[in-house]
Regions:
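Short cysteine clusters
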Residues: 152
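Cell wall/extracellular polymer interaction/catalysis modules
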Residues: 1-149, 159-206
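Conserved "landmark" site that anchors the functional core of diverse proteins
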Residues: 156
């Protein structure tokens, strides 16, 4: 009898330096965005890229003052006002949830823009965290204009609410590009160019 493969949430971008992507799980499909630095196998802290590869999904965090969490199978915890995520490679708590304020560089989990109202922690560079290979890689809510992230994978709010009901501890995240050999820097500073790229992507025959 052949082994049953665990489900995989696949994120595929058009090219290694693109930020526009499609995610799929079984027959379901969602539009999403990745980092402004594209998808890279050689990701480092602060490069704005999403790491290529296959990773576990650890657990999820949510704002219980902003949404009602549906039934999920991943471990879940409500975000507090003093929760942060350490992005300082010098810290012993690098790429970990921390209490803030503290002396190390970190990002706030309690955000006013709604991007972290719901997020899933991706098991990237966390077992254990090493060097400066990057931190705080999440699945989270996208901005309304679906602009690139700083390295996470972002979805429309309703889509992410659906996704978290379908994934579990056995689910893996696979991120790759159609042209995985392309590894060019892709600075994105012109918002109009970003939106034009998104429109062109949406018109492709999928």
């Amino acid at each position: 009898m052949s082994a049953v493969l665990p489900p995989v949430l696949t994120v595929q971008v058009d090219s290694a330096d693109s930020s526009l992507a499609w995610a799929s799980l079984g027959e379901r499909r969602w539009r999403c965005v990745v980092g402004a630095g594209g998808v890279r196998e050689d990701k480092v802290e602060g490069d704005g890229a999403t790491p290529a590869g296959t990773y576990p999904l650890r657990h999820l965090y949510f704002r219980n003052d902003r949404l009602v969490l549906p039934k999920v199978r991943l471990p879940a915890r409500a975000i507090g006002e003093h929760d942060g995520w350490c992005d300082d490679p010098r810290s012993p708590a690098y790429n970990r949830l921390v209490r803030i304020p503290n002396e190390w560089s970190h990002e706030k989990m309690w955000r006013e823009d709604g991007l972290y109202d719901l997020l899933v922690v991706v098991g990237y560079n966390d077992d254990p965290p090493e060097g400066e290979w990057g931190s705080a890689i999440f699945l989270h809510i996208a901005r309304d204009d679906m602009s690139p992230t700083h390295g996470c994978v972002a979805f429309a709010r309703d889509d992410l609410l659906e996704i978290v009901t379908l994934i579990g501890p056995e689910t893996k995240l696979n991120v790759h590009s159609v042209s995985a050999a392309e590894q060019r820097p892709r600075p994105r500073s012109d918002e109009d160019d970003d939106m034009k790229q998104f429109e062109d992507f949406d018109e492709q025959d999928w």
